[in-house]
Amino acid sequence: MTIRRLISTSIRATIISLLLVLTAAPASAQLKFFALQKDSIPVFRGFSVSFDMVGAGMALFGDRGQYEAGLRLNLHDEWFPVVELGYGRADCEDEVTKIRYKTSAPYFKVGIDRNMLKNKHGDNRLYAGLRYGYTSYKANLSRPGLMDPTWNWESDYNVQDAPCNMHWMEALIALDVKLVGPLHLGWSARYKFRLFHKDGDFGKTWYVPGYGINDSSKFDATFNVIIDI
């Protein structure tokens, strides 16, 4: 077992164990975990919108990437339900095989973050969170024709609009730093792993919108511009 696979397995086991512990814990303990701090601050504290700059940069200047925006509700500066919507794309040709892979599709993620700092109402926040993601996309593969030396005709390879989809989870740690007024900057490190997936009949797809390179698990990062509203 490689070090990367060992780390991925350990993280996945930890996440599942925590979920099982929360599920099996007495109702009083569960309520205590999800309870808000008691003070004079109102429960609803507004919401914010965010834009991921890493994925946008990759999409603009590379052969794959995504444009992603998020909406985050603020409940008492402690709990933050999140919806993230995006559009991922890839257009890449292998230098050796000359096989070209192309896809583009929208995706969504829903989840929740918790502010882990003791001072919940400060300007900066440290989040731990979970996401569930889904996308339905179509994959296209093509390769230039090759001349068959025996029959002396050209043989090509072409797959168009093969239907695919994927469900996945993300566990994340994120930092939110206030700059000035409603403007924040945010960084997140994410561990992603597949739940269910359907590849095309031709085999494993190379890139999945919103998930990235199609492995059973992977690490990822975001850099966000955040505006409080």
PLM regions with names:
Residues 54-57, 94-101, 155-161, 208-213:
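Extracellular loop and loop/strand-boundary signature of outer-membrane beta-barrel proteins
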Residues 79, 84-152, 222:
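Gram-negative (and chloroplast) outer-membrane scaffold detector with strong preference
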Residues 31-45, 78, 117-125, 179-185:
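Short loop/turn motifs that connect adjacent beta-strands in outer-membrane beta-barrel proteins
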Residues 45, 63-67, 104-108, 124, ...:
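Residues that define the transmembrane beta-barrel architecture of outer-membrane proteins
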Residues 73, 114-116, 175-177, 227:
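Residue-level signature of outer-membrane beta-barrel architecture
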Residues 47-55, 83-87, 128-134, 187-193, ...:
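Transmembrane beta-barrel strands of outer-membrane/channel proteins
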Residues 27-74, 84, 224-229:
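Short glycine/proline- and aromatic-enriched beta-strand/turn motifs that initiate or cap beta-hairpins
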Residues 171, 178-229:
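Predominantly the C-terminal beta-signal and adjacent terminal strand-loop region
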